[in-house]
A protein has these predicted regions:
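Electropositive, glycine- and tryptophan-enriched low-complexity nucleic-acid-binding patches
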Residues: 1-37
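A eukaryotic "domain-edge + linker/cap" signature
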Residues: 20, 28-352
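Long mid-to-C-terminal assembly/interaction modules of large eukaryotic proteins
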Residues: 321-402
Length: 402
């Protein structure tokens, strides 16, 4: 509906589309008036993701709804005036226009089209002012009902933003505990020759795609050979919901196999050495601090993210109206508080889905849960990292508002 993502352009697209739909309904005899203001006055809510342009669009749309309401109220009030009463108001407005133009001489120097435009704008503003005066005569309750326009954010995006906040907040944990070795830095190293000779060319892009596809295929074949089925690594290159958390779960579940695979790759290379990226990955897999983060993210994904999405988007969801999910969202925060107070519900011999999972149902990926428990004894700070993640996630700005 819009050629770009500016909020103003999107609003214009909405207005144009509603006008088209409403006119079609009028031509089809489904509505008695070809006036889209009837639609906008009935609209009471807007549902979108949490992007800044969408939140601004909500504000603009609310103002548009209010503007149209005041116009209709003004028109109704004007119809109740006598001709002389309305003519008097227009005359007073015209006098103001003449004064703003510099007096009668300045007014006459304006073109006919410009004078007509200013008079038309004055009449529109007069209608709005009368409508606003009529609105102000309503009680506070009536005003609230007239201007009712709610915004609800996308649950999926809200959880994604909260999860991202928790991940970013992990850096704070290591900064606050300098006595503990932080995750191993994994610096990039660009292929300078490729950049100089073919940066941005189609050939370079195709070569990169073929390389990535080849590595993925080799990994799938290796997993199929080792465990009897292949695994597609989550597409973390794209903005796909929960792909990063799912990737952490996959890595920790098959950590030994990933390390074994990279060793296999190294042994089968003519140079007998991994490239920079492959060596980075192998170093990260061996890094104890990185394993702490992989396990903490996996536990959060299993305990909160998956059951949360089951409730708001799953086939057995109890409610499909976001306005009725306020109690559920409060329960999410309450459960996170429980896990902060009792991390043993997720880590340790007494950890279980009954106490640890938001919905107390079986783990979506029990293999990932048990893999974390296997590595937990060798991760002395896992509980502290997990609690820090949960605290940061709970306090991400706006987390309590859905």
């Amino acid at each position: 509906m819009a050629v770009n993502h500016t909020s103003e352009t999107q609003l214009a697209g909405w207005i144009e589309s509603i006008e088209d739909f409403f006119h079609l309904a009028y031509e089809s005899k489904l509505v008695s008036e070809n006036d889209t203001r009837t639609f906008w006055n009935l609209v009471t809510g807007f549902h979108s993701d949490h992007a800044a342009d969408q939140q601004k669009l909500f504000v603009l749309m609310k103002k548009w709804k209010q503007q149209l309401d005041r116009e209709k109220r003004g028109e109704r009030a004007i119809r109740g005036l006598t001709d002389n009463e309305y003519a008097c108001l227009v005359f007073q407005g015209s006098q103001v226009l003449v004064q703003k133009a510099g007096g009668p001489v300045g007014w006459e120097q304006l073109s006919f089209e410009e004078r007509s435009r200013r008079i038309m704008d004055m009449k529109k503003q007069l209608t709005k002012d009368i409508g606003e005066a009529e609105f102000q005569r309503l009680s506070d309750v009536e005003k609230s009902e007239v201007d009712l326009f709610l915004w609800a954010g996308c649950c999926m995006h809200k959880e994604m933003n909260a999860f991202k906040g928790g991940c970013v907040g992990l850096d704070e944990f290591w900064d606050e505990h300098p006595e503990i070795s932080s995750p191993l830095p994994l610096p990039n190293r660009d292929n300078a020759a490729t950049i100089q000779l073919a940066s941005g060319t189609a050939a370079a892009t195709r070569a990169k795609t073929r390389t990535e596809r080849g590595a993925q295929d080799t990994l799938r074949f290796y997993f199929d050979y080792k465990i009897g089925f292949n695994l597609a690594f989550p597409d973390t290159s794209n903005t796909r919901f929960q792909s990063h958390a799912e990737a952490c779960a996959l890595i920790i579940t098959h950590l030994d196999l990933f390390i074994e695979f990279l060793t296999y790759v190294k042994l089968n290379k003519g140079s007998g050495a991994l490239n920079h990226m492959e060596q980075n990955v192998l170093n990260g897999l061996h890094d104890i601090a990185t394993r702490h983060e992989l396990c903490a993210i996996t536990l959060y994904w299993l305990a909160i993210s998956i059951p949360y999405m089951r409730e708001v988007r799953g086939p057995n969801a109890k409610e499909d109206n976001i306005l009725k999910l306020d109690g559920f969202h409060r329960r999410v925060i309450e459960h996170i508080d429980i896990l902060i107070a009792h991390p043993e519900f997720l880590v340790g011999p007494n950890a279980s889905a009954i106490n640890g999972s938001l919905d107390s149902l079986s783990w979506e990926r029990p293999d990932a849960f048990y893999a974390v428990q296997t590595y937990a004894p060798g991760l002395p700070h896992l509980t502290a990292v997990l609690v820090h993640f949960l605290n940061i996630r709970k306090n991400v700005p706006g987390s309590e508002v859905f």
